[in-house]
Structure formats: C-alpha cells, structure tokens
Curated annotation (Swiss-Prot):
Function: Does not have cyclase activity. Plays a role in 40S-ribosomal-subunit biogenesis in the early pre-rRNA processing steps at sites A0, A1 and A2 that are required for proper maturation of the 18S RNA. RCL1 activates BMS1 by promoting GDP/GTP exchange.
Name of the protein: rRNA processing protein RCL1
Keyword terms of this UniProt record: Acetylation, Nucleus, Ribosome biogenesis
PROSITE patterns, per the entry: RTC
Length: 367
C-alpha cells in the first residue's frame, strides 16, 4: 500500500451516523463506517441516510463519498464547507428536522451563507420538529456566537405524505465558537408553545392546549400556548396535528423542549397532557441544557478556542448516546470531556469540562 494513502478513522454500525459525518467534516479527517446493519434482513444504508450524504455533498466542495455494493460500508473524505443556496427533497421516511439539525453544526463555519429549502414531512415522533429546532437548538447556537440563524415554515406537511416546506437561513459565519461557562441551573420563568394542525378541525388544536394546561396549571410561571391552524395549499398533503412546548429562562436565555404528534385515533387532550409531562420530566432530568440540545453544545465546546469551557449537566443525561458521542469525539478530535460532581452536597449534577481544540474556519479563510 502506498504511504500516501489516507488513514481512515474507522467506526462500526449505524448508530450516530449523522454526527460522525458532521465531526469528520468539521475536522477534515477521512472516516470509514463499516458493518452498517450487516446483520439485518435489509442490510446497509437506509434511503434517508443516502439522502443525508447527498445533502452533505451539496453543502461541501471536494467531498468524496464511496458506498460499497451492499451499502454496509461508507468511506467519506470530507471537503470544504461551502454552503450556498440549494433545495433538498427529503424522503418520506424521515422529517425535514432529521436533515436540518446536522446543518446547524456546519453552517456557521461555511464559506458562504447557508440558504437551504427543505421539502417533505415537517414533524414526526422521533426526530426534531420545526419549533424544537427554532426554540430549542438555535438558542444554543446563539450562546456560542451564532446569532443570525432562522428557520422559516412555508408549508406544514404531516405524515405520511408530507408536502411541507422549510427554509433554513444561517447568515452568521464565524471563525470558531466562543467559550462556554455555564455552571448554574437556569430558573424557568415561562412556558410557551404551539399546538398546530393540518387539514383537520381547528377544535383539535384547542383540545391539545387544554390538555397541556391541565398539567401545567400548578406551575409558578406564565404559560402561553398558541394555536396554529393550517388550511389550503400550505397545509401539506395529509391531515395531522401536534404540539411543542418550551420552558424558558429569561434571565439566562436557556430553554428545554418537548414535542410529539398525534396518530390516527389518538385523543388530542391526551397528547397535550403527555407532552406537558414530558416537558416536566425533561426539566427535572436536565441542567443547563436539555437532553436533545446537549450534543450540539458539546461539539461547539470541543471546536471552540483553546480555552477551558464548562457546562453543567445532569447525571440522567449521561446515557449510552452521550457516551458514544464522547468516544466519537475522542476518536476524531483526540480530545476528552472531563466530568466531575458540582459539589459533595449535589449528587444530581456534574460539570463537563472541555478544552477547545482551537478549530479555525478554513472555509472562511479561503473565502
């Protein structure tokens, strides 16, 4: 073998697929992902993972992606993040949030501003919805200096047929994230949210709101949930409804969120109650950031300045997914996250300490 052949950082399995591609793109290091569902009846990449790789190709220049005949091995040699304007058609197997979320890791470090129109389903049970990204993830970006970032809902599209359109615009282009120091728990001052529907009776929206308020009424803070009823050509191709709730700290600017959508035959009041209970659980099992915001915060801290950053996290957040993330960061960036208790009296929270790698936005330099 030639000595000039690239050395690949190798991963196995389909878990953390998007983030491994994102980390490789940020680091510029080639990776190899093998044994992707090799033991399944339908082995290899799913259609949405192939679609995600196409999206990565469209926002980078010089990336090389090789997929084996069986689809169980992917070799990725990252190029430069260039961004720009594009349209991405999402498969019906995943909502637009599955594709928007990883772009939040890349867009601020691009050569050009990101302007991507995503078409497809706008909500699902398992992936981030539009409001969760707008009110939950983008505020985390703002904490790291990414302030000009927006997600516009042009059309809602409920499963299974979708028909939604979402426009991601990221105008902030920064050299590197600012250093994070957040060692306190934010105090929740208000709960906001939106209950939405497409091609169904507007009464379902009010019933979801009533169900959520029934759970949240005893909280010592303001609760404001708005109704968002979509009709006509902007309401997609399928009937559907859902609710997103966000707990906010006005003093600190942090937020937690919970969301879900209704299924055929489900009761709107029960969905509202369920999501409200999920929000309360998220608050109780979080510290500075929620469970679904933690990966974004950790990655931004890793690629920050060569300074020590600190973030308060809850022990409940140290799960298998978090451990896999830390191992992947160690493999690609060769840096570690150190965890220590807040103090002897506090057995719930830990302080995550990270020294930034001094990442530099090479795309911006080339620009």
């Amino acid at each position: 073998m030639s000595s000039s052949a690239p050395k690949y950082t190798t991963f196995q399995g389909s878990q953390n697929f998007r983030l491994r591609i994102v980390l490789a793109t940020l680091s510029g290091k080639p990776i190899k992902i093998e044994k992707i569902r090799s033991g399944d009846l339908n082995p290899g990449l799913k259609d949405y993972e192939v679609s995600f790789l196409r999206l990565i190709e469209s926002v980078t220049n010089g990336s090389v992606i090789e997929i084996s005949y069986t689809g169980t091995t992917v070799i990725y040699r990252p190029g430069i993040i260039v961004g720009g304007a594009s349209t991405h058609i999402c498969p019906s197997s995943k909502p637009v949030g599955y594709f928007v979320e990883p772009m939040l890791y890349l867009a601020p470090f691009s050569k050009k501003k990101f302007s991507i129109l995503f078409k497809g389903i706008t909500a699902s049970h398992n992936d981030a919805g539009i409001e969760a990204i707008k009110w939950g993830l983008m505020p985390v970006m703002e904490k790291f200096g990414v302030r000009e970032c927006a997600l516009h809902t042009l059309k809602r599209g409920s499963p299974p047929l979708g028909g939604g359109e979402v426009h991601l615009v990221v105008d902030s282009l920064i050299a590197q994230p600012i250093t994070m120091h957040e060692i306190d728990r934010p105090i929740i001052s208000s709960i906001t949210g939106v209950a939405y529907s497409t091609r169904v009776s507007p009464s379902l929206v009010n019933r979801m709101i009533d169900g959520a308020k029934k759970v949240l009424k005893n909280l010592q803070c303001e609760v404001n949930i708005t109704a968002d009823v979509w009709r006509g050509e902007n309401s997609g191709k399928s009937p559907g409804w859902g609710i997103t709730l966000v707990a906010q700290s006005k003093q600190k600017g942090w937020s937690y969120f919970a969301e879900d959508i209704g299924d055929a035959g489900s009761i709107p009041e029960e969905l509202g109650e369920k999501v409200a209970c999920q929000l309360l659980e998220e608050i109780s099992k979080s510290a500075a950031v929620g469970r679904n915001q933690l990966p974004l915060a950790i990655v931004y801290m890793v690629i920050g300045k060569e300074d020590i950053g600190r973030l308060r996290i809850n022990k409940e957040q140290i799960d298998e997914r978090f451990i896999i993330l830390l191992r992947d960061i160690k493999k690609i960036f060769n840096t570690e996250v150190f965890l220590k208790p807040v103090d002897e009296a506090d057995n719930e929270d830990m302080i995550a300490t990270i020294k930034g790698i001094g990442f530099t936005n090479t795309s911006k330099k080339i620009a």
